[in-house]
Structure formats: structure tokens, C-alpha cells
From Swiss-Prot:
Protein name (database record): Protein CexE
Source lineage: Bacteria, Pseudomonadati, Pseudomonadota, Gammaproteobacteria, Enterobacterales
Listed InterPro entries: CellEnv_BiogenAssoc_sf
GO cellular component terms listed in the entry, alphabetical order: periplasmic space
Species this chain originates from: Escherichia coli
Signal peptide as annotated in the record: 1-19
Subcellular location: Periplasm
Designated gene of the protein: cexE
Up-regulation conditions: Transcriptionally induced by CfaD and Rns.
Domain of life: Bacteria
Length: 120
């Protein structure tokens, strides 16, 4: 009886492996930052859009590995002022950076932020 139960368990495990069971979630073959592109036409100072031309990016979302790409950006102004914003870029949804060309009378001097990452 023990041999029979062991045989059934092994057979089920083999079928599960053949059928793609187990942890089929693999990391994407593309870095999150490669799936977004800066778009100067979004908002007053720009934003980011999904890069539809990258098949690996589209596949990453289509297969459910991630919802999209998380973005965190900081716009810096003269006088030490800054405005931060965060959002998700995904197919059909852009991320518009908060801020403008000036803030409290101070000109924008730079924009930057954290490395984009896959948002699950």
C-alpha cells in the first residue's frame, strides 16, 4: 500500500511539472526602465508613457508578472525647493510629473528620481 501511495504522489508530481505546475512566475527578460519613454507633451513638464514597441514589456504585463512600471520622480527648483510625485505607467495609463516650469517664483533646475521598477 505504501508503494502504491508513493507511486501516485510521484506520478502527480511529474504530471504537474509537465503541465507547467509549480512556480511558473519568472522574472521578466527586460528591465522596467526599458518599458517607459519620456513624453514632453504630458503635463507642463512632461511625464512617461508605455513603450508599446517593446514586445518583452508587453509580454511581462500580458502574462501577469507585473501590472506596470512604478515611477518616483523629483523636480528640483532654485532655492532648494522640490516637488515629488509617484505613479504607475502601464499600457493605456501615463504618469504625469507634478510641478511646473516654476515653483513659488523659482525656476526648475533639474528632474530625477529612483530607478523604475516592476509593480506587481
Amino acid at each position: 500500500m505504501k508503494k502504491y501511495i508513493l507511486g501516485v504522489i510521484l506520478a502527480m508530481g511529474s504530471l504537474s511539472a509537465i503541465a507547467g505546475g509549480g512556480n511558473s512566475e519568472r522574472p521578466p527578460s527586460v528591465a522596467a526602465g526599458e518599458c517607459v519613454t519620456f513624453n514632453s507633451k504630458l503635463g507642463e513638464i512632461g511625464g512617461y508613457s508605455w513603450k508599446y514597441s517593446n514586445d518583452a514589456c508587453n509580454e511581462t504585463v500580458a502574462k501577469g508578472y507585473a501590472i506596470g512600471v512604478a515611477m518616483h520622480r523629483t523636480v528640483n527648483y532654485e532655492g532648494g525647493y522640490s516637488i515629488q510625485s509617484s505613479g504607475i505607467v502601464k499600457p493605456g495609463s501615463d504618469f504625469i510629473m507634478k510641478g511646473g516650469k516654476t515653483y513659488k517664483g523659482h525656476k526648475k533646475v533639474s528632474a530625477g528620481g529612483d530607478t523604475p521598477y516592476w509593480y506587481k
